[in-house]
Amino acid sequence: MTTLSTKQKQFLKGLAHHLNPVVMLGGNGLTEGVLAEIENALNHHELIKVKVAGADRETKQLIINAIVRETKAAQVQTIGHILVLYRPSEEAKIQLPRK
């Protein structure tokens, strides 16, 4: 799991601002297929948005915690139903500022 400093999180939030959600969770919740899609998107993009729809606060937080745990990605930000995740790939596309 990647730990990010406040400076790095602010940098990633700025990059993520213009992104659209790549993965959207529906009524079925967090399935193996959704996790595989998130993994694929993280490998390809490093920084993604995931939309967690139609859940109450506690359920949404449990889903977010499960996604972060399973993907070993860093949770950059959560606003409403949108989760921003970051995980560096082998060939880093995003150069983070120093801690």
Swiss-Prot record:
It comes from the Bacteria. PROSITE patterns: CRM. InterPro entries: RNA-binding_CRM, RNA-binding_domain, RNA-binding_YhbY, YhbY-like_sf. One of its GO terms (molecular function) is RNA binding. Residues 2-98 form the CRM domain. Keywords: RNA-binding. It holds the Pfam family CRS1_YhbY. PANTHER family: RNA-BINDING PROTEIN YHBY (PTHR40065:SF3). This is RNA-binding protein HI_1333. It comes from Haemophilus influenzae (strain ATCC 51907 / DSM 11121 / KW20 / Rd).
